[in-house]
C-alpha cells in the first residue's frame, strides 16, 4: 500500500510539471558561457539586409568576442558571418549600400590595440583600415555623398605625428581641479583624462589602391563631443555637448551643436533647459527631432524623457509629449543586454516627415510607437506581442521596415524585422540561443498588480520554479532594482531564471521611484529615498504570501546599486528576511557624497551638503542603524566601482557588522566596476551568481558550505 501511494505521488508530481519542462533541465549559471548576444542592428538603405554585431564568450580566455554578421530581411537565408575579428563593432552602411564601415580592435604582441575604423566592400573583398589613430577611434558615420566618414577619437593632432629621438619623461602626478575626476568604466584608477576629451574627426575615403589621407579633427577644445551626425546636405556635422565648465554646479544641460564639415566655429543648433540624449534630422533637413530631459524647476531627481521637435536653425523647441506620461526612449533593466557593441537608439522620421517612431517604456514593456511630428499625438503603439523589450533598432531609407533586437523573459535578445514599422508582429531572423534554450525548462513570470500602504498601485512579477506546484512551500527571494529610476519588466534576466531553477520563487517589483510609470510616480521619492519605496516592497512580499505557497521562514532579499541601498535599508527595518545579499551598494550617504564619480552638488537627492545637514544624511543611511541588523548579510563589490564606491557601501557595513559579531561576508571582484552583473568578465559574472545563490542556499535551503563558515 505504501508503494502504491508513493507511485501515485510520483505520477501526480510528474503531471504537475509543465509539459514544456518534461525531459529538460534547469538553466545553470555556467550556461552564460554559451549565450549569444545580438546588438546594434543596422538596416541596409534598401531594406533588404541587416548588419549586426554577434557577441559570444571565449570561456578559456575569459573574454567576449564580437564579429559582424548579416541577415536577409526576408529571412530567405540563414544569417552569415561577415568579419573574422574578435572585437568588431558599430557596423554602418554607406548611403548606396555597397560598403560597410565598422570599428575593429586587433591584437598586437598579445595586447588589444586601440580600435580603428575599417571599411569593407559588400560585393566581396577584405576589410581595410582607414584610420591609424594613437587612441580609440569609434562611431563611424557616413557623409550623405558616401565620400567621407566622421568618427570620434580622443587623440590630439600631435599624437599622429611620428616621434623621433628619446621620449621625454612624462610625470605621472595628477593635478586635479574639478570635483568630478573619476568615471566608472575607466579601467584601473578611473581617472578622467581631461587633456584628451572625445572630439569629432573626419577622413576622406581613399580611392582603390591609394593610402588613406590624414584625418582631420573637426571639433576641439576642452569639452567632449558625442553623438555626431551629418546634416542632410552634408555641409555640417552635428554633435551633443555640455560646454559649461564645472557643469556639476548646475542642473544637467546638454545641447546640439553644429560645425562645418571642415571645422571652424561651433554654433548652437538646438538648446533646451535640460539634457539632449538622442536626435535625428528630418528628411528635408529643416527640422530636428530629439529626446530631451527637461531640467525642471525646482530641480528633480527624476525627469521623464520626452520627444521634442525644433525647426533648424534657430527654431524654438517644442515638447511633443509633455502630456504623455510614459518614458520616451525608455528601457527595462536586466542582466543580458549585449556586453559589447550596444548602441543607443533614438527617433526615426517617416519618409514624408509627418511621423516619428521611437521606443516607449511603459508598465514593464519597451516597444516602438509612432507619434505625429506636429501634434505629438500617439498614432500607434505596441504590436501583437507587447510583453517584450525592444533594445535597439534602425530603419531602411524609405522607413518601411525596421530591424530590432527584442528580448522577452524567456529569450535573450534576437534579431527581428517589423514590416510597416509598428503594429505588425515582429519576424524572428536569428535563433542563436534556440538550441540551448530548447534544452532548458523555463517559464515566464506571473504579472501582478497590488495595492501599497497608501492605495498606490504597484506592478510586479513572480518568477516560479519550472516544476512549480502550488501545494508546496517555496523559499522566496525579493529582488530590488537599482537606479532608483529604472524598471523591471519583460526582458530576460539570467539571475532570476537561475534562482527559479534552483527552487526559489523570485519576486521583483517596480516600487515608487521607478521609471516608466509617469513623472509623479518617478519623482515622488526625491528627498525621501529610502523610505516609502521600502513599504511598497514589503506590500509586494505580503501580496505573494497571501498565495499560500511561500515558506515565510525562508525569505531572502537582494539588489544592486540603488537596490543594494534598499537591501541594506530592508535589513535595518525588519528581521523577516533570513539572508540578504547587498550588491554595489550604498550604506553611508555622506561617504557617497564625497567619493562617487558624480556629484550631488545640485539638490536632486538632498537639499544640502552633508557637512551642512549631517542629521538628514545620517537619517537616510543604513549604517546609522547597523545595530539593528540581525540578517546574515553578504556584500558583492567591484574593486573598480567608482559609481557606488565600496568605501561608501559594503566596506563600511562589513566592518561594522564584524565589530558587532554578526554573520557577514564580503566578496570582492578585482578589476570590476559597477557593470559587473551586465558586462563583467564572464567568469566573474558566473562566480557572482554562485556566491549570491550560495549564500541563500546556506540560510534558506540549509545547505552547508565551507566557503561561508
Question: Model-derived features: where do they sit?
Answer:
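Beta-strand-rich domains and repeat architectures in extracellular enzymes and scaffolds
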Residues: 30-66
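Short glycine/acidic-enriched loop and turn motifs that connect beta-strands
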Residues: 56-60, 106-110, 156-159, 244-247, ...
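Active-site-proximal cap/loop segments of hydrolase catalytic domains
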Residues: 495, 501, 508-709
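Cap/lid segment of the alpha/beta-hydrolase catalytic domain
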Residues: 244-245, 326, 423-424, 430-553, ...
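Predominantly five- to eight-bladed beta-propeller fold
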Residues: 64-66, 154-211, 240-243, 250-255, ...
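Bacterial N-terminal signal peptides
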Residues: 6-16
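Conserved beta-propeller blade repeats
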Residues: 35-50, 85-103, 126-127, 132-152, ...
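Short loop/turn segments that connect beta-strands within beta-propeller blades
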Residues: 72-76, 121-125, 205-209, 260-264, ...
Amino acid at each position: 500500500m505504501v508503494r502504491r501511494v508513493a507511485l501515485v505521488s510520483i505520477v501526480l508530481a510528474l503531471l504537475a510539471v509543465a509539459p514544456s519542462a518534461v525531459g529538460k533541465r534547469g538553466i545553470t549559471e555556467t550556461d552564460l558561457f554559451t549565450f549569444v548576444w545580438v546588438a546594434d542592428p543596422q538596416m541596409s538603405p534598401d531594406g533588404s539586409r541587416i548588419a549586426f554585431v554577434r557577441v559570444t564568450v571565449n570561456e578559456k580566455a575569459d573574454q567576449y568576442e564580437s564579429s559582424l554578421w548579416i541577415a536577409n530581411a526576408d529571412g530567405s537565408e540563414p544569417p552569415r558571418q561577415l568579419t573574422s575579428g574578435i572585437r568588431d563593432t558599430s557596423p554602418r552602411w554607406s548611403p548606396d549600400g555597397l560598403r560597410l564601415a565598422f570599428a575593429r580592435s586587433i591584437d598586437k604582441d598579445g595586447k588589444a590595440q586601440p580600435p580603428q575604423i575599417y571599411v569593407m566592400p559588400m560585393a566581396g573583398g577584405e576589410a581595410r583600415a582607414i584610420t591609424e589613430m594613437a587612441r580609440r577611434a569609434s562611431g563611424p558615420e557616413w557623409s550623405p555623398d558616401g565620400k567621407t566618414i566622421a568618427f570620434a577619437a580622443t587623440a590630439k593632432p600631435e599624437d599622429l605625428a611620428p616621434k623621433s629621438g628619446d621620449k621625454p619623461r612624462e610625470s605621472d602626478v595628477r593635478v586635479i581641479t574639478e570635483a568630478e575626476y573619476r568615471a566608472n568604466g575607466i579601467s584601473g584608477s578611473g581617472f578622467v583624462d581631461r587633456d584628451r576629451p572625445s572630439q569629432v574627426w573626419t577622413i576622406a575615403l581613399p580611392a582603390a589602391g591609394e593610402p588613406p589621407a590624414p584625418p582631420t579633427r573637426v571639433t576641439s577644445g576642452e569639452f567632449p563631443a558625442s553623438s555626431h551626425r551629418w546634416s542632410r546636405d552634408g555641409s555640417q556635422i552635428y554633435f551633443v555637448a555640455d560646454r559649461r565648465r564645472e557643469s556639476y554646479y548646475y542642473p544637467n544641460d546638454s545641447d546640439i551643436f553644429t560645425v562645418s564639415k571642415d571645422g571652424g566655429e561651433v554654433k548652437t543648433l538646438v538648446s533646451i533647459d535640460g539634457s539632449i540624449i538622442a536626435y535625428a534630422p528630418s528628411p528635408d533637413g529643416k527640422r530636428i527631432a530629439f529626446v530631451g530631459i527637461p531640467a525642471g524647476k525646482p530641480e528633480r531627481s527624476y525627469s521623464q524623457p520626452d520627444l521634442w521637435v525644433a525647426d533648424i536653425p534657430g527654431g524654438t523647441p517644442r515638447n511633443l509629449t509633455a502630456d504623455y506620461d510614459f518614458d520616451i526612449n525608455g528601457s527595462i533593466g536586466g542582466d543580458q543586454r549585449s556586453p559589447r557593441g550596444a548602441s543607443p537608439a533614438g527617433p526615426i522620421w517617416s519618409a514624408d516627415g509627418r511621423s516619428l517612431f521611437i521606443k516607449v517604456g511603459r508598465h514593464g514593456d519597451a516597444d516602438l510607437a509612432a507619434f505625429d511630428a506636429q501634434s505629438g499625438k500617439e498614432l500607434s503603439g505596441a504590436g501583437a506581442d507587447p510583453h517584450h523589450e525592444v533594445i535597439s533598432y534602425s530603419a531602411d531609407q524609405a522607413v518601411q521596415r525596421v530591424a530590432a533586437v527584442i528580448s522577452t523573459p524567456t529569450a535573450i535578445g534576437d534579431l527581428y524585422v517589423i514590416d510597416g514599422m509598428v503594429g505588425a508582429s515582429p519576424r524572428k531572423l536569428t535563433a542563436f540561443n534556440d538550441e540551448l534554450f530548447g534544452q532548458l525548462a523555463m517559464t515566464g513570470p506571473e504579472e501582478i498588480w497590488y495595492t501599497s500602504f497608501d492605495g498606490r498601485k504597484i506592478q510586479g512579477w513572480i518568477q516560479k520554479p519550472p516544476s512549480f506546484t502550488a501545494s508546496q512551500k517555496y523559499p522566496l527571494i525579493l529582488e530590488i532594482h537599482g537606479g532608483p529610476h529604472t524598471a523591471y519588466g519583460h526582458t530576460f534576466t539570467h539571475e532570476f531564471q537561475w534562482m527559479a531553477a534552483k527552487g526559489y520563487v523570485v519576486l521583483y517589483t517596480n516600487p515608487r521611484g521607478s521609471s516608466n510609470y509617469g513623472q509623479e510616480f518617478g519623482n515622488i521619492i526625491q528627498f525621501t529615498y529610502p523610505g516609502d519605496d521600502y513599504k511598497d516592497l514589503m506590500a509586494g512580499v505580503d501580496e505573494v504570501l497571501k498565495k499560500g505557497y511561500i515558506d515565510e521562514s525562508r525569505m531572502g532579499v537582494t539588489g544592486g546599486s540603488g537596490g543594494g541601498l534598499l537591501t541594506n535599508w530592508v535589513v535595518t527595518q525588519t528581521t523577516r528576511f533570513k539572508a540578504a545579499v547587498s550588491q554595489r551598494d550604498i550604506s553611508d550617504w555622506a561617504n557617497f557624497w564625497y567619493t562617487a564619480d558624480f556629484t550631488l552638488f545640485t539638490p536632486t537627492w538632498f537639499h544640502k551638503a552633508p557637512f551642512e545637514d549631517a542629521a538628514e544624511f545620517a537619517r537616510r543611511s543604513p549604517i546609522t542603524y547597523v545595530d539593528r541588523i540581525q540578517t546574515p548579510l553578504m556584500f558583492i563589490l567591484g574593486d573598480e566601482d567608482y559609481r557606488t564606491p565600496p568605501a561608501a557601501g559594503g566596506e563600511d557595513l562589513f566592518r561594522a557588522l564584524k565589530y558587532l559579531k554578526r554573520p557577514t561576508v564580503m566578496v570582492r571582484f578585482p578589476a570590476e566596476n559597477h557593470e559587473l552583473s551586465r558586462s563583467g568578465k564572464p567568469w566573474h559574472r558566473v562566480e557572482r551568481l554562485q556566491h549570491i545563490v550560495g549564500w541563500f542556499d546556506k540560510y534558506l535551503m540549509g545547505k552547508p558550505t565551507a566557503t561561508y563558515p
